[in-house]
Every structure is written in structure tokens, then in C-alpha cells.
């Protein structure tokens, strides 16, 4: 796979994370507004109710789930905003502007990547969920979403050139990926986990964050898994291109 094709493939995968936002915008709002008045009110009301639960006196599992749902809600909003930016170069519409301003005035301040000019996922809700109930039934999904969004927010065009990713952060993400691999959960995309974990091992190889032999062995195992389970996957082609000498 040529570099130009690889870059296109990675942008396609990143855009795939925004597909839900595109569907929501097509189905539920006016032609030029990513977010309607009703959607804005519903989002803010939901975030307010979730905050009351997350910061209340409910059992840890219930508060953890509220944090998880907060993260999912914020990422749903983020997908809509980013789809607007991708389509029009900026967010559009009065209600969208009102929602962005209200979020920025709250604890849910939005952060725009200076490199991609897209809104970044907020890891805090997922980390709060894991801190409250690390072995609960919502923990695996929180870990997966943190793992997934960290990856797609971490680079511009080339995943082996991450933006300011520390060794500690890389090793944490590898640990998350290894923890997620054996799980069978409808909310966790196994192909995505294998792909991102493979890329992280290639990053660890490039940065010498882990022994060379270990990184090469794990990448080979992941590629072998792809060839047997997802042989026509674009992710397999990307892994093969990135791992070739």
C-alpha cells in the first residue's frame, strides 16, 4: 500500500468514528444545522441529570455508569460537531453555537485539536467510571472507548507519528488493549481492538518503549489473527503496510 493510499485509509477509519454523527444529523435536524433546539435542550438536560447521579451518593456502580453515559453523550455531540467541520470547514447554526458556548462554560469544556482542527474526546468521564468501578459491568466499555478515542485523536495523518504521546500513555494503552482482547462483548469491536493494539506495538517498536522482539512478535500474532478472521479488512492492509520493512 502506497503512503498516499495509507493516509487515505486512515482518514477513512477516523471518519468512520463520525458516522453515527452523520446519521444523527441527517435524521434529526435541519439541513444546515448539526444540532436543533430540541437536541440542544435534550443534550444539556441529559448531561445535567447524569452529573447529579455521578456526583451524588448512589452506589459506585451507578455513579460509574453515569460517568460512562456522560462520556458517550459528549462523544455523540463531538461527532456531530466534527462532521459539520469536515463537511463545511466549521460548525454552523445558532443552536450549535449556543450548545458549544454552554458546554465551554461548564465542566464539559470542549477541546479543539490545533493539528486536526477537530474536537477531541474528553477522557475524564471514562477514567472516572473506571476509578469508581474498575471491575464492574460498564468497565470494559469505558476502557474500550477510552482506548479507541485516544488512538484516533493521537495523530494527524500517520499513526506512527503520534502527537505528544508519552511512553507512560503508550504503555497504558497497550495494557488496555491486551485486557480487551479476550473479551466477548457486543459493545466492543474486536477488530478495532486488534488493529489499534497492533499500531501501538508498532509505536512501541519505533520509540523503543518495549523490547523489539516482543513488539515484533505481537504484531505478527495480530496480523495472523486478521488474516484468519478479517482477511479483506482495510485495517489488515494498513497493518501490513506499516509493519513491512
Enumerate the predicted regions with their spans:
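Intrinsically disordered, low-complexity peptide-like regions
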Residues: 1, 28-31
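Bacterial N-terminal signal peptides that target proteins for export
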Residues: 3-17
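Bacterial N-terminal signal peptides
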Residues: 16-26
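Acidic, polar-rich low-complexity tracts and alpha-helical solenoid repeat scaffolds
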Residues: 30-245
Amino acid at each position: 500500500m502506497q503512503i498516499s493510499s495509507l493516509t487515505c485509509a486512515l482518514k477513512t477509519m477516523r471518519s468512520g468514528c463520525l458516522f453515527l454523527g452523520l446519521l444523527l444529523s441527517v435524521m434529526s435536524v435541519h439541513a444546515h444545522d448539526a444540532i436543533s433546539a430540541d437536541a440542544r435542550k435534550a443534550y444539556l438536560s441529559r448531561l445535567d441529570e447524569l452529573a447529579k447521579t455521578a456526583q451524588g451518593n448512589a452506589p459506585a456502580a451507578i455513579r460509574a455508569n453515569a460517568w460512562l453515559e456522560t462520556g458517550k453523550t459528549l462523544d455523540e455531540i463531538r461527532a456531530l460537531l466534527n462532521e459539520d467541520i469536515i463537511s463545511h470547514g466549521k460548525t454552523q447554526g445558532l443552536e450549535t453555537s449556543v450548545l458549544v458556548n454552554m458546554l465551554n462554560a461548564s465542566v464539559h469544556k470542549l477541546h479543539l485539536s490545533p493539528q486536526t482542527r477537530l474536537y477531541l474526546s474528553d477522557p475524564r468521564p471514562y477514567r472516572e467510571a473506571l476509578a469508581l468501578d474498575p471491575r464492574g459491568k460498564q468497565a470494559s466499555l469505558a476502557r474500550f472507548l477510552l482506548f479507541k478515542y485516544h488512538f484516533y485523536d493521537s495523530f494527524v495523518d500517520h499513526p506512527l507519528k503520534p502527537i505528544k504521546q508519552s511512553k507512560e500513555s503508550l504503555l497504558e494503552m497497550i495494557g488496555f488493549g491486551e485486557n480487551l482482547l479476550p473479551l466477548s462483548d457486543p459493545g466492543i469491536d474486536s477488530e478495532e481492538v486488534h488493529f489499534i493494539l497492533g499500531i501501538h506495538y508498532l509505536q512501541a517498536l519505533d520509540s523503543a518503549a518495549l523490547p523489539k522482539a516482543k513488539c515484533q512478535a505481537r504484531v505478527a500474532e495480530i496480523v495472523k489473527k486478521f488474516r484468519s478472521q478479517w482477511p479483506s479488512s482495510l485495517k489488515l492492509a494498513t497493518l501490513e503496510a506499516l509493519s513491512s520493512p
